[in-house]
From Swiss-Prot:
<comment type="subunit">
    <text>Binds the alpha(V)beta(3)-integrin.</text>
</comment>
<keyword id="KW-0325">Glycoprotein</keyword>
<keyword id="KW-0765">Sulfation</keyword>
<feature type="repeat" description="LRR 8">
    <location>
        <begin position="258"/>
        <end position="279"/>
    </location>
</feature>
<feature type="modified residue" description="Sulfotyrosine">
    <location>
        <position position="413"/>
    </location>
</feature>
<feature type="glycosylation site" description="N-linked (GlcNAc...) asparagine">
    <location>
        <position position="187"/>
    </location>
</feature>
<feature type="repeat" description="LRR 6">
    <location>
        <begin position="213"/>
        <end position="233"/>
    </location>
</feature>
<keyword id="KW-1015">Disulfide bond</keyword>
<feature type="repeat" description="LRR 10">
    <location>
        <begin position="301"/>
        <end position="322"/>
    </location>
</feature>
<feature type="modified residue" description="Sulfotyrosine">
    <location>
        <position position="31"/>
    </location>
</feature>
<feature type="glycosylation site" description="N-linked (GlcNAc...) asparagine">
    <location>
        <position position="316"/>
    </location>
</feature>
<feature type="domain" description="LRRNT">
    <location>
        <begin position="53"/>
        <end position="91"/>
    </location>
</feature>
<feature type="glycosylation site" description="N-linked (GlcNAc...) asparagine">
    <location>
        <position position="113"/>
    </location>
</feature>
<feature type="repeat" description="LRR 4">
    <location>
        <begin position="165"/>
        <end position="184"/>
    </location>
</feature>
<dbReference type="Pfam" id="PF13855">
    <property type="entry name" value="LRR_8"/>
</dbReference>
<keyword id="KW-0654">Proteoglycan</keyword>
<feature type="region of interest" description="Disordered">
    <location>
        <begin position="381"/>
        <end position="406"/>
    </location>
</feature>
Length: 423
């Protein structure tokens, strides 16, 4: 037995060696294969979380009252959820949607970790000025857009961060605008204050002048009786509809050389300087629903002019276009003059001075006895270039008998030049 023991030991060692070589060959063969570059695990697992839960969702987090889509991990949607308070905002969130809720207060505690916020939408809530914690927005150093329209604000929210670019405060009850409210807002390009209670005393000369990058200012439906002073020269779009403005000072627009569109309809304008709108960049001008008795000089680059619902009895072409240039044509393409007191159509000479006109809308005119009359006229394009004629062959030149509402033309007006999309 002692003699066989060494032999058994040798056989055993040899067998073990062969088996190990075989097993090594099998595993080496498996791992020598080329890796699958298309392989992308659906989840990344962490030792401290439960299996089957996405790794990034647990790390980044989302308020339980809200929804954070996986394809937009930095956005949090809390809109239309009947919320009364703002939930705690996780640090990674950049876009916060809280519109259409019942929120009354904005507390600093909700934003204590929200250092990366770029856009906040708190529109259509019940927020009051006295229930906004002081400085809650100013601490958000990355904030670019703030929506607070359709709330119950009585005062301009102050202070605000320097990073802010778009501020929407329409449809509130704002009547107080502190002189230093705009201090530091050097990057704001769009400010909407329509449908508030602002008076002339709140818009002092230096209130808006420091906003050096402001391009769009909406002050429609307030309580203004005069043109706002101290507007920055960067302004391109100015909305002043539905106020009580009765006059425009001489040379008022000299400091606004970049102005592209001016809306000052539904005011009390009567007499304005003849060449007050002589601006080289002005494209759209709406002075409808005022008390103007005569037309004015039309600048060369103006394309859309709205004169409806005034007191104009006649339009002298030589007055609106004193020196036609056959080389550098005026750009006017659309003119609306309905609901005035015109007794006859504008002279056909207008098409020589404005060869690009596509249509003149006369609609109904008001007579001295209060009745309405319909002018019998057609719009001709005899001075247009041949290509323009070909493009419009299929259109009807006759405007007779058409009824055009303000809403219809306002919508068209916005389609032609959507202000907010240009900013």
């Amino acid at each position: 037995m002692g003699f066989l023991s060494p032999i058994y030991v040798l056989f055993f060692c040899f067998g073990v060696r062969v088996y190990c070589q075989y097993e090594a060959y099998r595993w080496d063969d498996d791992y020598d294969q080329e890796p699958n570059e298309d392989y992308d695990p659906e989840f990344q697992f962490h030792q401290n979380i439960e299996y089957g839960v996405p790794f990034y969702n647990n790390i980044l987090g989302c308020a339980k009252e809200c929804f954070c889509p996986t394809n937009f991990p930095t956005s949090m949607y809390c809109d239309n959820r009947k919320l009364k308070t703002i939930p705690i905002i996780p640090m990674h969130i950049q876009q916060l949607n809280l519109q259409f809720n019942d929120i009354e207060a904005v507390t600093a505690n909700s934003f204590i970790n929200a250092t990366h916020l770029k856009e906040i939408n708190l529109s259509h809530n019940k927020i009051k000025s006295q229930k906004i914690d002081y400085g809650v927005f100013a601490k958000l150093s990355n904030l670019q857009q703030l929506h607070l329209e359709h709330n119950n604000l009585e005062e301009f929210p102050f202070p605000l961060p320097k990073s802010l670019e778009r501020l929407l405060l329409g449809y509130n009850e704002i009547s107080i605008l502190p002189t230093n409210a705009m201090d530091g807002l050097v990057n704001v390009t769009m400010l909407d204050l329509c449908y508030n209670h602002l008076s002339d005393s709140m818009l002092k000369e230096k209130t808006l002048s420091k906003m050096e990058k402001l391009m769009q200012l909406n002050l429609c439906n307030n309580r203004l009786e005069s043109m706002p002073l101290g507007l920055p020269s960067s302004l391109m779009y100015l909305s002043l509809e539905n106020n009580s403005i009765s006059s425009i000072p001489d040379n008022y627009f000299d400091k606004l050389p970049k102005l592209h569109a001016l809306r000052i309809s539904h005011n009390k304008l009567e007499d304005i300087p003849y060449d007050i709108f002589n601006l080289s960049n002005l494209i759209e001008l709406n002075v409808g629903h005022n008390k103007l008795k005569q037309a004015f000089y039309i600048p060369r680059n103006l394309e859309h002019l709205y004169l409806q619902n005034n007191e104009i009895e006649s339009i002298n072409v030589t007055m609106i276009c004193p020196s036609p240039d056959p080389v550098h044509h005026h750009h006017l393409t659309y003119l609306r003059v309905d609901q005035n007191k015109l007794k006859e159509p504008i002279s056909s000479y207008i098409f020589f001075c404005f060869p690009r006109i596509h249509s003149i809308y006369y609609g109904e005119q008001r007579s001295t006895n209060g009745e309405t009359i319909q002018l019998k006229t057609q719009v001709f394009r005899s001075y247009q270039e041949e290509e323009e004629e070909d493009d419009h062959d299929s259109q009807d030149n006759t405007l007779e008998g058409q009824e055009v509402s303000d809403e219809h033309y306002n919508s068209h007006y916005y389609e032609m030049q959507e202000w907010q999309d240009t900013i």
